């Protein structure tokens, strides 16, 4: 079992590493490529677009051909794209490399969640996804620090060579450690069960909405945090970095505590707690009389996301044994596209950073609480009872 957990964690971590590690080198990258930092900030959106594009096909291929045939090319593409970025001499080539990086990371991301669905029951999967969420929270803190240390002695290209090395590690794990987990092709008697795993299942759609809104909350916070903390609240750059590190610490602590909480409370209780924390955060930020109270509201955001997201993802994947890859892809596409659409629309309409965050917090909490309370899970899927995997 440990081999599946290690491989899944490694596959997922390419995604945040690809986002956060290069940011520290952005000024030098812009200077070398004769582009402005503003022009290269689009590299974040291009990377996410690559991930979304990969998710359009990766899930279906993973369900038809297996998890390894998607993970191995995905890791290989991430390696090639990282090297391509390091060799880019124009901003256009750099952005093309970032898109390819996103494609590779997206393939690996989809496979990771499908593997966890294949190998873990509902309760254990919720615990593992909560732990995975905590580990993922470490990357936005450690990756820029690692990038800074690398750039003390090496050029910005070394950041992408480091990502390539990470990709090589994931590729080796996928080739030699990971075993295929895709359920065997269903017999004729299992066809009704396969056909019943519809993506239009009300329970699944409700969890897609909940997780998409939750990701929109956390990405809105990350996207607006420089404006909120430095421009509006007046913190210096060093203080901003400290605050973000502390919020990551809150996220990690809550994420690592959630598996223990699942041994005491029902998953539904933790999901309700998550949304109540979001609502409390929105109200706190809306009426905050001081910076201290606002910072408390921000910690509620991090705690709310960490306590509920892994549980919601586990519930979303629960109904799917034979179509776990497609379900994972659907979740990923909805989360990436939904959160990006919200941030883009809010910017186009001219909603300020503060109101953007408050608005998504309150909307997420109200909609999600209604869905949690009124959309009950269907008949438990028996698919995890005995799954015969390909060797």
UniProtKB/Swiss-Prot annotation:
<keyword id="KW-0046">Antibiotic resistance</keyword>
<feature type="transmembrane region" description="Helical">
    <location>
        <begin position="203"/>
        <end position="222"/>
    </location>
</feature>
<feature type="topological domain" description="Cytoplasmic">
    <location>
        <begin position="63"/>
        <end position="68"/>
    </location>
</feature>
<dbReference type="InterPro" id="IPR023697">
    <property type="entry name" value="Multidrug-R_MdtL"/>
</dbReference>
<keyword id="KW-1003">Cell membrane</keyword>
<feature type="transmembrane region" description="Helical">
    <location>
        <begin position="293"/>
        <end position="313"/>
    </location>
</feature>
<feature type="topological domain" description="Cytoplasmic">
    <location>
        <begin position="114"/>
        <end position="133"/>
    </location>
</feature>
<keyword id="KW-0472">Membrane</keyword>
<protein>
    <recommendedName>
        <fullName>Multidrug resistance protein MdtL</fullName>
    </recommendedName>
</protein>
<feature type="topological domain" description="Cytoplasmic">
    <location>
        <begin position="1"/>
        <end position="3"/>
    </location>
</feature>
<dbReference type="GO" id="GO:0005886">
    <property type="term" value="C:plasma membrane"/>
</dbReference>
<feature type="transmembrane region" description="Helical">
    <location>
        <begin position="269"/>
        <end position="289"/>
    </location>
</feature>
<dbReference type="Pfam" id="PF07690">
    <property type="entry name" value="MFS_1"/>
</dbReference>
<feature type="transmembrane region" description="Helical">
    <location>
        <begin position="4"/>
        <end position="24"/>
    </location>
</feature>
<feature type="transmembrane region" description="Helical">
    <location>
        <begin position="158"/>
        <end position="178"/>
    </location>
</feature>
<dbReference type="InterPro" id="IPR050189">
    <property type="entry name" value="MFS_Efflux_Transporters"/>
</dbReference>
<dbReference type="InterPro" id="IPR020846">
    <property type="entry name" value="MFS_dom"/>
</dbReference>
<keyword id="KW-1133">Transmembrane helix</keyword>
<dbReference type="GO" id="GO:0022857">
    <property type="term" value="F:transmembrane transporter activity"/>
</dbReference>
<feature type="transmembrane region" description="Helical">
    <location>
        <begin position="245"/>
        <end position="265"/>
    </location>
</feature>
<feature type="transmembrane region" description="Helical">
    <location>
        <begin position="69"/>
        <end position="89"/>
    </location>
</feature>
<feature type="topological domain" description="Cytoplasmic">
    <location>
        <begin position="266"/>
        <end position="268"/>
    </location>
</feature>
<feature type="topological domain" description="Periplasmic">
    <location>
        <begin position="90"/>
        <end position="92"/>
    </location>
</feature>
<feature type="topological domain" description="Cytoplasmic">
    <location>
        <begin position="314"/>
        <end position="330"/>
    </location>
</feature>
<feature type="topological domain" description="Cytoplasmic">
    <location>
        <begin position="179"/>
        <end position="202"/>
    </location>
</feature>
<feature type="transmembrane region" description="Helical">
    <location>
        <begin position="356"/>
        <end position="376"/>
    </location>
</feature>
<dbReference type="InterPro" id="IPR036259">
    <property type="entry name" value="MFS_trans_sf"/>
</dbReference>
<keyword id="KW-0997">Cell inner membrane</keyword>
<feature type="topological domain" description="Periplasmic">
    <location>
        <begin position="223"/>
        <end position="244"/>
    </location>
</feature>
<feature type="transmembrane region" description="Helical">
    <location>
        <begin position="331"/>
        <end position="351"/>
    </location>
</feature>
<comment type="function">
    <text>Confers resistance to chloramphenicol.</text>
</comment>
<feature type="topological domain" description="Periplasmic">
    <location>
        <begin position="25"/>
        <end position="41"/>
    </location>
</feature>
<feature type="topological domain" description="Cytoplasmic">
    <location>
        <begin position="377"/>
        <end position="391"/>
    </location>
</feature>
<comment type="similarity">
    <text>Belongs to the major facilitator superfamily. DHA1 family. MdtL (TC 2.A.1.2.22) subfamily.</text>
</comment>
<dbReference type="GO" id="GO:0046677">
    <property type="term" value="P:response to antibiotic"/>
</dbReference>
<feature type="transmembrane region" description="Helical">
    <location>
        <begin position="42"/>
        <end position="62"/>
    </location>
</feature>
<dbReference type="InterPro" id="IPR011701">
    <property type="entry name" value="MFS"/>
</dbReference>
<feature type="transmembrane region" description="Helical">
    <location>
        <begin position="134"/>
        <end position="154"/>
    </location>
</feature>
<feature type="transmembrane region" description="Helical">
    <location>
        <begin position="93"/>
        <end position="113"/>
    </location>
</feature>
<feature type="topological domain" description="Periplasmic">
    <location>
        <begin position="155"/>
        <end position="157"/>
    </location>
</feature>
<feature type="topological domain" description="Periplasmic">
    <location>
        <begin position="352"/>
        <end position="355"/>
    </location>
</feature>
<keyword id="KW-0813">Transport</keyword>
């Amino acid at each position: 079992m440990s081999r599946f957990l290690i491989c899944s964690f490694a596959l997922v971590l390419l995604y945040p590493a690809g986002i956060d590690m290069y940011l520290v080198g952005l000024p030098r990258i812009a200077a070398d490529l004769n582009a402005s930092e503003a022009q290269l900030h689009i590299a974040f959106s291009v990377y996410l677009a690559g991930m979304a594009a990969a998710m359009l096909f990766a899930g279906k291929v993973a369900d038809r051909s297996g998890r390894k045939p998607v993970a191995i090319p995905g890791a290989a593409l991430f390696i090639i794209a990282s090297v391509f970025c390091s060799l880019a001499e124009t901003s256009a080539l750099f952005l093309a490399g970032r898109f390819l990086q996103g494609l590779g990371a997206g393939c690996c991301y989809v496979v990771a969640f499908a593997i966890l669905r294949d190998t873990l029951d509902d309760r254990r999967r919720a615990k593992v996804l909560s732990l995975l969420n905590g580990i993922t929270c470490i990357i936005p803190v450690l990756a820029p620090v690692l990038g800074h240390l690398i750039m003390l002695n090496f050029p910005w290209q070394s950041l992408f060579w480091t990502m390539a090395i990470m990709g090589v590690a994931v590729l080796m794990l996928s080739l030699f450690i990971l075993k295929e987990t895709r359920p065997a092709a269903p017999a004729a008697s299992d066809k009704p069960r396969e056909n019943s795993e519809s993506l239009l299942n009300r329970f699944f759609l409700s969890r897609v909405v909940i997780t998409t809104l939750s990701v929109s909350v956390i990405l809105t916070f990350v996207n607006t945090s420089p404006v909120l903390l430095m421009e509006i609240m007046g913190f210096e750059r060093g203080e901003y970095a400290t605050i973000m590190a502390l919020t990551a610490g809150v996220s990690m602590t809550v994420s690592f505590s959630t598996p223990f909480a699942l041994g005491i409370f029902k998953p539904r209780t933790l999901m309700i707690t998550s949304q109540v924390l979001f609502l409390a955060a929105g109200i706190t930020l809306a009426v905050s009389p001081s910076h201290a109270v606002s910072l408390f509201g921000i910690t509620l955001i991090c705690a709310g996301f960490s306590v509920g997201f892994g549980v919601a993802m586990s519930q979303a994947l629960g109904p799917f044994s034979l179509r776990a890859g497609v379900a994972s892809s659907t979740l990923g596409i909805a989360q990436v596209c939904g959160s990006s659409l919200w941030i883009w629309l809010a910017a186009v309409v001219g909603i300020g950073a503060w109101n953007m965050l408050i608005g998504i917090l309150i909307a997420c909490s109200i909609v999600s609480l209604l869905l949690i309370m009124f959309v009950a899970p269907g008949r438990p899927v028996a698919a995890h009872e005995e799954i015969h995997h390909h060797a």
